[in-house]
Amino acid sequence: KPNAGKSSLINKIAGEERVIVSDIAGTTRDSTDTVIENEYGKFVFIDTAGIRKKSKVTEKIEHYSVLRAYMAVDRADVCVIMLDASEGFTEQDSKVAGYAHEQGKACVVAVNKWDLIEKNDKTMQEFRTKLENDFSFMSYVPFVFISAKTGQRINKLYELIKFTYGQNSMRISTGMLNDVLAYATTRVQPPSDKGRRLKIYYITQPSTKPPTFVIFVNRA
């Protein structure tokens, strides 16, 4: 979403005014790459223009911004979905999150401008519960509450980026998968097809990003 703080985050971690930042939504018109190398590893951050509501897409350049945002998702290994804490989950956030999910990308939800929210000891948990409902179609995605302006929890964001990348790239041996499958079938019997019990032969993992599994059964 425009003006959620994506460019401010890039500038904070880069330590320079790498991307134009202003209070005007949509300042970033193009996707720009920033290479960062630190104690967490080497990263290439792709900053994009946010996706606007349809009613606000009045210029051809905005159409290109939407296309470039989706192209950035296609290029990325991990998608950091930046939310504005003062606005919560919006239609535009849903679109980009849904696209990243459909493309099988590792994702992290970063709730920005957390320093501007009035809080008590329950605020974060209440916000997290609401986000879990909003992101019910992506229940596997971790959340982090940050401030791109102050740098609050940026280290945690790095950790989650590395963690989700590792999870999405994970390859599990066929032997381990079949041990798990054998245990599962002792607990729950395979379903029946037209009155005949299905027999599961084995499971394998043909690919990663995202981890994909194929189970071989009779009558399939």
Which residue stretches match the model-derived regions?
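C-terminal-of-GTPase-core extension/linker across diverse P-loop GTPases
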Residues: K1-I46, K54-L67, M71, R75-M82, ...
